[in-house]
Amino acid sequence: MAARAVFLALSAQLLQARLMKEESPVVSWRLEPEDGTALCFIF
């Protein structure tokens, strides 16, 4: 359950990453709407 809480917390940063994705192409993210908590960050 703790991991799920972390994913939910990262969802807020995910929105910011989407706005800065054009400025930071090195940061790629993927969100799976099926679960809503599956986030994959690649730095």
Curated annotation (Swiss-Prot):
The UniProt record lists the keyword Cell inner membrane: no
InterPro entries, alphabetized: BAGE-like
Gene: BAGE
Pfam families: BAGE
Subcellular location: Secreted
Keywords linked to the UniProt accession: Secreted, Signal
Family: Belongs to the BAGE family.
Listed GO CC annotations: extracellular region
Note: The ancestral BAGE gene was generated by juxtacentromeric reshuffling of the KMT2C/MLL3 gene. The BAGE family was expanded by juxtacentromeric movement and/or acrocentric exchanges. BAGE family is composed of expressed genes that map to the juxtacentromeric regions of chromosomes 13 and 21 and of unexpressed gene fragments that scattered in the juxtacentromeric regions of several chromosomes, including chromosomes 9, 13, 18 and 21.
Protein's name in the database: B melanoma antigen 1
Predominant subcellular localization, coarse grouping: secreted
Signal peptide: 1-17
